[in-house]
Design a protein with these regions (language model features):
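Adenine nucleotide phosphate-binding catalytic loops in nucleotide-utilizing enzymes
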Residues: 1-70
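Short, surface-exposed beta-strand/loop "edge" segments at domain boundaries and coil↔beta transitions
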Residues: 4, 95-97, 171-176
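Residue-level signal for inorganic ion chemistry
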Residues: 17, 21, 119, 163
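Glycine-rich phosphate-binding loop signature in dinucleotide/nucleotide-binding domains
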Residues: 28-31, 79-83, 153-160
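Short, surface-exposed connector motifs at secondary-structure boundaries
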Residues: 55-57, 110-116, 137, 154-160
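Generic beta-sheet signal
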Residues: 58-59, 84-88, 159-165
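Active-site beta-alpha connecting loops in nucleotide-dependent enzymes
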Residues: 63-142, 180-183
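Generic C-terminus detector
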Residues: 127-135, 139-184
Length: 184
């Protein structure tokens, strides 16, 4: 119907989601005149490019549970041309699956093609994540304490921070970010 749809979400996968929702609503015969307003008012939650403002740092939290999702996250981070810090948190609890071999299927070499001031690895499997990055010649900072990793980047980073987490790291990391956002 030649409708122009505007959305302020990063990540190409969001285009699919937005268009799928539009197509479903249109097929169901719903009124769509306010679709752009609904998109503008929508605030992603629970680690879906969720935004936090901590001191003078913009922080985006995003969930990555598998190679396809992680590669989409990397694409979303690449869309941002500004200097950035990146934290990658990987756990291996039951809900994540204890086999983390999937990390070798992620195109982490693409981190070289972005304006990353630093990459920090954290979480239960931070050593494995650091090794994975080493194999594609990407230096990383190892910080097992998640809150310290975030605080360090907020204090000494470039003011633009991406935090990429797998499932069991999401909720605890989100709580840390909410706590830090509330500190003055």
């Amino acid at each position: 119907d030649n409708r122009k749809i505007k959305a302020n979400y990063r990540g190409f996968y969001n285009v699919y989601n937005i268009l799928a929702a539009y197509a479903a609503a249109r097929t169901a015969g719903l009124e769509l005149k306010n679709y752009n307003k609904v998109l503008a008012d929508y605030n992603p939650q629970n680690g879906r490019m969720e935004h936090f403002r901590i001191k003078n740092t913009d922080v985006l939290l995003n969930l990555a549970k598998n190679p396809a999702g992680f590669n989409q996250n990397i694409s979303a981070v690449q869309e941002d041309d500004k200097p950035k810090d990146i934290i990658v948190l990987i756990n291996d609890r039951d809900q994540d699956g204890i086999d983390i071999s999937w990390l070798w299927d992620v195109d982490f070499d693409r981190f070289q093609d972005m304006n990353a001031a630093s990459i920090t690895v954290s979480g239960i499997r931070c050593q494995d994540m650091r090794l994975r990055l080493k194999y594609v010649d990407i230096p990383s900072i190892l910080e097992g304490d998640v809150e310290k990793a975030i605080r360090d980047r907020v204090e000494d980073g470039v003011g633009n921070l991406y935090v990429l987490v797998n499932y069991t790291a999401l909720f605890s990391t989100r709580n840390i970010l909410k706590k830090l956002e509330g500190e003055r």
